[in-house]
C-alpha cells in the first residue's frame, strides 16, 4: 500500500486482511520500491493514483518483467488518461480498474472493473468508457448531476456530481458554514464537475474549484494535463490559471521533467495546441523540481496558483 491508510486505502487494506492476505506497507511513494515489490513479492493488488501509474510506465525497468500475479491495479484520486490505461494493460495485463470516491462519502461512489476496462479497450464502440470512472456502487443510495440552481440534469449534461445515502457524512466538525455549503438542495455536493451517460457511467471533467475561465471560455485543467502526460519529457504536471490582464486567467502548465529529458517550452506548447487547439493550450509552461503535494499525494493547485501569481521565478 502506497497511499496513506487514513482514508480509502485503509478500507482496501482491511479487505486484504479479511481475505487472509498480506499488506506491504510503504513509507513513501518510492518508485524503485514499488517495482521491487511487484517483481519479487507476488503482488496481487496495487492501489496507486494516476500520476504514479504514469511514472511507473516511464520507468526503464518496468517492462523487464511479467506480472502474472497481479489481478487488480486500482487507480483513484483523479481520472486517468485513456491512452495510459491501454499502455498499462500492455505492461501489466487486463488488471486496470478505477473508483471515484471521497472521504465525505464514506464508501467508493463508483467502480469500473478490470473486465469492463479490458472490454472497452478491445471494442471501438465502447472505447469512450476508458475515460469514465464507472457506475454507482451499491453502497451509495443515489448519485446525480446538478446545476447551480439545484436542478438535476439529464444524461449527457455536465454539472456538479451530487450524492445521497446513509454513508454520507453528517457534516464537518465545528464548521456549520462549510457543512451547509456542501449540503445544499438536500444533496451532498462533491465539488467535482462531470456527467452521466445513458447507461449510468460517470465521466469526471475536473474539480469545480480548479476550472479556469480564460477569454470567456471554461477550461478544465485535467484535459490539458492528460495531454501533457503523453509527452516524453513530462514526468509529472499540473495546470492552473493565473491572473492575466488580457485573458482574465492564463492557462499555465507546471511540469517535472522526466529523467534525462530536455525541455523546449514552445515545442511543448505547440504539442498541446495540436491536440487541444489554441484556446486550451497553455500560454506558458514552467519547470519545477517538485510539485507541492498534500499528505495523501495530491498536487496542491491552490499553492501553485499563489506562487505563480507572485512570479514564476519563485517556482
Task: Enumerate the predicted regions with their spans.
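Glycine-centered tight turns that cap/initiate beta-strands
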Residues: 61, 69, 93, 139, ...
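Conserved AMP-binding/adenylation subdomain of ANL enzymes
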Residues: 6-45, 59
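Acidic/polar alpha-helix N-cap and adjacent early helical turns
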Residues: 306-315
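Active-site glycine-centered loops adjacent to acidic/histidine catalytic or metal-binding residues
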Residues: 77, 101, 134, 192, ...
